Amino acid sequence: MVEKWGEDYFLLGPYFPQKAASEFEPILDLDDSPAGRTVRRMREMGYSVQYGYWLVTGKPRVVLFDVASMYPLLDRIKFNLWESQRISTINTEDLVNQTLLFGEAVRVYLTAYADEHAKKSDVTAQFHEWMSSSGLSDLRKDNVKIALSFTTHATMLGRYLAQNVTDFYGKLPFFDWEQEARHYNIVTQATIERLSAQNAHVLTTVSDVTARECEVFLGRMPDLVTPNGLNVVRFQAVHEFQNLHVKYKERIQEFVLGHFFPSYSFDLDKTLYFFTSGRYEYSNKGYDLTLEALARLNWKMVQANMDMTVVMFIVTKQPYHSITPHVLQSRAVLDELQETCTAIEKQVGERLFLATAAGSDHKMPDLNNFVDEYWRLRLRRTIQTWKTDELPAFVTHDLVESDGIVEFCRQANLVNNERDRVKIVYHPDFISSTNPLFGLDYGQFVRGCHLGVFPSYYEPWGYTPLECVVRGVPTVTSDLSGFGDYIMQIMRDYENRGIYVINRKSQTFTQAADQMADILFKFVKMQRRDRIMQRNRVENISDVFDWTNLRSYYDTAHDLANKRRKP
């Protein structure tokens, strides 16, 4: 967007000082651009507004509103929403109150901006989700000279109902949106979302899957679909991203070595790393299907007497007390073992060289004689501390409460038994570079894995499989995710390119689990050379999802919004 619009493109957002410290660069001297003049005008009106650059790719200009300073206005804002739109805001939680304050700041800013600039050229405001759009309906009602485009990346009711109602898609046409909103106590959110969709000049959503929800819950079919993309950075040579895979796989192997090898060992050269990640929505994100398929995969591999091992990482966010002490200790002892072995290696190497250079015969020296008693004793003690009779933990943290993932693993006996070919590592915290277990950021972790697994039941788009594709990692998705549905529309040979789509629309849960287990088993049986070739093929299609190519969908939406604003 910055490439196309330059100085005429800027973003509006809430101001959070802690985040702004590392992601925001203020412009201290306000420029004379329409955005800068509008900031000055809002400050004169008494609002606390920050203006500067967002420190991401493209470095777009951004206007940030300090919603915390606006709380004295909350009652008036709620009264006006009821008077003008009949939006009920009684007893709303603080997060909703913050969105109402932010929405009002956006309304005030855009009204002032239109007065300043709309006479000279077309102005389009692109709203993403209901959290930004509580003021949209009033902008339309007041006939502010701005084209209004509203994009929903999911629906509030869809997310709640898909998680709690069986056969959500079969029952979708028959839901009463208002009744369901009251049932889940999200009347304010659902009403803002619905009115924003109806009052925008253009409504878009991220997939055909979500478009069907919009018709039922928002009372309007989207004018067009605007697929999500990423800023794709391609390497000049194929071997570069393959080398990164090897580099980060070795880091993951360090964790696996420390986590599993105190109990038992397996061949790391014949080990594959699968992962799934996302917010904790047990059925929506397909964790239930993933675990069921893994249990079946484990049975298939054991029955086939395979010497391959699959380590499955489940990365999500759940409340926990701390990392399990035993898991941390294993990692610490591994570091101690490595340090001891490195010291012995250095000592033996130096003494072997001197003994060989000074020797008069051609006999191989006894290497044991080159190791000091201190290092022998230290190695022996470290090994004794290292080894254990306990099974490797299948969850890395001490959870506040047990959850569906833990319960399934216990019931299915998928608890890292030595004979099992599928090992589970449930990591209930998002991965970052400060993580003591991996020392990788999320993108590096993804590159080090062999397969991403995301057979979602409710996923309006699905960034996680897309993040795999742009990093050259094969992925599993579903036809109920926006990404999977889009892939099936634009590509015939997607499976050959490393994108596996599970049929969840017309299959039962059991049938989908069988299909997924077969896909995973087929992947495990692939030769290393075939996996390398597949990584090349999946990385080659990443340009399809670059914003450079997908921005045109938003360009079309904005052009249409401006035409409708001034017919």
Where are these regions (language model features)?
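Catalytic cores of nucleotide-sugar-dependent glycosyltransferases that transfer UDP/GDP/TDP-activated
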Residues: V2-P567
